[in-house]
């Protein structure tokens, strides 16, 4: 096995170099869209911080989810964040898997261009809704008596532009309808549902999305309406965007690449059958000529 790994290591680096060259050419073509997507993430964060200046703490609203789900408490608020970070990190790793995997169905740059469009459309609607109506935040740091529930007017423009990072991001209030975490989660899960290849991962991803939604409500980070609105809004937005954008073409397989690890017996037989069928087709074409 060590001998095999030593022999395949140069192939791995050639694969990474080849993929990096391809992705660099795509990035040179699509860099404006990628940059716009990144800039909009900052704009979304700026808006979420800006609405905190308008937030006024008050009694927690009556909520069916709060009635059904017992509060986890402040000491267990990290549960939902742990699930979210797992989903977020796993999705990022998956989008970069073409650099090392011999199975290449997507291009990293193209998949992120599409993801940024999904996010920008959903977050634009979110900005409109949380500026239209500010609800009293249910989170512990947004309740009456908390020093973080209200923030004084900014002293200068720079204070607003810097979003009081990182506290302004972690301890925000007022940006409720609808849940930002749920936007990211559903965009990532639905994107993998469409372009991923592992069925069990798709099922697991949807399960984790449901669990995260439940944990967010149980942590009192959002009202139930914030989660419900996110679920149908993001799905409708992605459906609409997909109907307007051209379908992202799958990568052509071309010549069968050499795998990084030995193929199983079943895979080897399937590969042999494919090679044999390809050879027959080539011979038939030659005979016709």
UniProtKB/Swiss-Prot annotation:
Presence of keyword Membrane: yes
Membrane topology category: Multi-pass membrane protein
Tissues and organs where the protein is expressed, per its UniProt entry: Mostly expressed in stems and flowers, and, to a lower extent, in leaves, roots and siliques.
Biased composition (Basic and acidic residues): 266-279
CC annotations in GO: membrane
Keywords from the UniProt entry: Lipid biosynthesis, Lipid metabolism, Membrane, Sphingolipid metabolism, Transferase, Transmembrane, Transmembrane helix
GO molecular function, one term: inositol phosphoceramide synthase activity
Single biological process term from Gene Ontology: sphingolipid biosynthetic process
InterPro entries: Sphingomyelin_synth-like, Sphingomyelin_synth-like_dom
Compartment(s): Membrane
Region (Disordered): 249-289
Listed transmembrane segments: 33-53, 77-97, 115-135, 169-189, 199-219, 223-243
Enzymatic class: transferase
E.C. designation(s): 2.7.8.-
Pfam families: PAP2_C (PF14360)
Family the UniProt entry places it in: Belongs to the sphingomyelin synthase family.
Described function: Catalyzes the transfer of the phosphorylinositol group from phosphatidylinositol (PI) to phytoceramide, an essential step in sphingolipid biosynthesis.
Identification of the protein by name: Phosphatidylinositol:ceramide inositolphosphotransferase 3
Organism encoding this protein: Arabidopsis thaliana (Mouse-ear cress)
Taxonomic lineage: Eukaryota, Viridiplantae, Streptophyta, Embryophyta, Tracheophyta
């Amino acid at each position: 096995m060590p001998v095999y790994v030593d022999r395949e290591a140069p192939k791995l680096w050639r694969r990474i170099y080849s993929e990096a060259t391809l992705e660099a050419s795509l990035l040179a073509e699509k860099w404006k869209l990628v940059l716009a997507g990144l800039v909009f993430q900052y704009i979304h964060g700026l808006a979420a911080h800006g609405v905190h200046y308008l937030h006024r703490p008050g009694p927690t609203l009556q909520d069916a989810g709060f009635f059904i789900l017992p509060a986890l408490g402040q000491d267990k608020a990290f549960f939902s964040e742990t699930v979210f970070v797992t989903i977020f990190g796993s999705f990022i790793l998956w989008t970069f898997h073409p650099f090392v995997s011999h199975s290449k169905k997507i291009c990293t740059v193209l998949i992120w261009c599409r993801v940024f469009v999904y996010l920008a459309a959903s977050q634009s609607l979110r900005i409109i809704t949380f500026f239209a109506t500010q609800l009293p935040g249910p989170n512990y740091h947004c309740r009456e008596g908390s020093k973080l529930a209200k923030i004084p007017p900014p002293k200068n423009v720079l204070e607003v532009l810097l979003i009081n990072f990182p506290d302004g991001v972690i301890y925000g209030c007022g940006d409720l309808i609808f849940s930002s975490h749920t936007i990211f989660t559903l965009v990532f899960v639905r994107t993998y549902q469409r372009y991923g290849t592992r069925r069990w991962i798709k099922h697991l991803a949807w399960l984790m999305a449901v669990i995260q939604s439940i944990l967010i409500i149980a942590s009192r980070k959002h009202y139930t309406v914030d989660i419900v609105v996110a679920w149908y809004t993001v799905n409708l937005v992605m459906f609409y965007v997909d109907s307007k954008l051209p379908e992202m073409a799958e990568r052509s397989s071309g010549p069968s690449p050499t795998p990084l690890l030995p193929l199983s017996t079943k895979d080897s037989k399937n590969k042999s059958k494919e090679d044999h069928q390809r050879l027959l087709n080539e011979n038939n074409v030659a005979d016709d000529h």
